[in-house]
Amino acid sequence: MKIGIVTTWFERGAAYVSRQFMDILAKNHEVYIYVRGGEEYAKGNPKWDLPNVYWSNGLHTTYINKKEFYKWIKANSIETILFNEQQYFTPLVWCKEWGIKTIAYVDYYTEQTIPLFGIYDSIVCNTQRHCSAFDEFDDIHYLPWGTDIDLYKPKYTDGRLVEEGKVIFFNSAGMNPLRKGTDTFIKALYKCKELNSIRAIIHTQVELKQFFPELSSVVAELESLGILEVVERTISAPGLYYRADVYVYPSILDGIGLTVPEAISSGLACITSDNPPMNEFVHDDFGSLIPVTRLYARKDGYYWPQCRCDIDALANLLKKYASNSAKVVEMKKKARKYAIDKLSFEKNASSLSDIIENTK
C-alpha cells in the first residue's frame, strides 16, 4: 500500500512521532511524507530531507493548498493518509471526494472540534487520556506510546551516576520552555542552591530569556555557582539524556510528554507532573510525581486544562534525590528495565500497519 503522512518535519516532538510511524510502516508499505507548515523547515538537512519527502509551500499552520496537495497524491498514487496533529479540516473533505482513506493521529482538539474527527476513517491515540476524549467514536485505536529503546539508551548499563558523587538533573525545554515547566524547575533549583551535590542541565532550542526575562538573574546566579548549565541549540536525537541521572519535567500541558519515555529509556530516574499523560509513564520504583496546585484553561480552548506544579514540593524532591545517590542508581536501572519491557515503540506500534490496512 502507498501511504502518505501529513506532518511538520524537523527537530521537534511532532516530527519524531511521524518519523517513527514512517519507519514502522515502511517495513511493509511505501511511505511518503507531505511536509505542511510548522515552526521551521529542515529542508537541506540530510537527516530530514529524504527522497520520499515533499516540502510544500506551507505557512506556519496546518493549512494545505488543494492543488499542490492533489498533485502530490496523484504523483505518488497515495491510497491512505495519516494526518499528524492536523487542525485544518478542509483537506479531509477533499480526501473524501478523491476516495482517499484518512487516519488521524490525535494530539490537538477542543470541545468544539472533537465532533469533526468523525470525518476520519480511523483514529489513533497514543495515551489513555486521548482515548477517553474520543471514546464515543467507533473506529478508535489505542497504541501505547513508546520510543526507540536502541537509540535512547543509558551511558552506563549498571546505572552508575554520570559524575561520581553528584546527581545531575536534566530538563528538556524544546521549543517552548513555558509549556515544559522549565521556569518551575529553575525556581525549585534555586531553592536548592546551598546543596554542594546538586547539578542541573537545561536544553532549550530557544533563548530562555525570551520566555523568562524575570528569571535572568536567577539563571545567571545558578550558572555562576556552577549548579546550572544551559544549552541553547538544536541537538539531534538521542539528545543530552546521557549527561544526566534524573529527568525533571514539570510540564504544564502535553499531548504525549514525548521526552518522558525517552528519558526513561535512557536510564534516567524521572520526576514529572502528577497529571496525564505524564503520570501514565512514571512509576514509584523509578520516579516521583510532583503535586499539582492548580488546573486552568488554555486561552485557545484546548480540551484539557493546563496544570501548575508545586515548586516547594519539587524542590524537596530535588533535595531528596541529590542526597540519596545510591537510591538514584537503583532507580536508573529500574527505569531502563521498564523501558525494555513496556516502552519499545517497535513493539507497541506493531499493529499500526494492520490498523491502516483494515481501515474502511
Regions found by a protein language model. Give the residues of each.
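Donor nucleotide-sugar binding/catalytic pocket of nucleotide-sugar-dependent glycosyltransferases
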Residues: 121-154
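A charged, aromatic-enriched C-terminal amphipathic alpha-helix characteristic of glycosyltransferases
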Residues: 308-309, 313, 323-356
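Acidic anion/phosphate-binding donor-loop and adjacent secondary structure
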Residues: 114-115, 146-165
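Short alpha-helical donor nucleotide-sugar binding micro-motif in glycosyltransferases
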Residues: 117, 234, 239-244
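Conserved donor-binding/catalytic core segment of Leloir-type glycosyltransferases
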Residues: 6, 160-180, 186-190, 201
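Aromatic "clamp/platform" in nucleotide-sugar-dependent glycosyltransferases that forms part
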Residues: 252
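Short hydrophobic beta-strand element within catalytic cores of glycosyltransferases
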Residues: 269-272, 279-282, 288-289
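Nucleotide-activated donor-binding/catalytic signature segment of Leloir-type glycosyltransferases, i.e.
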Residues: 212-235
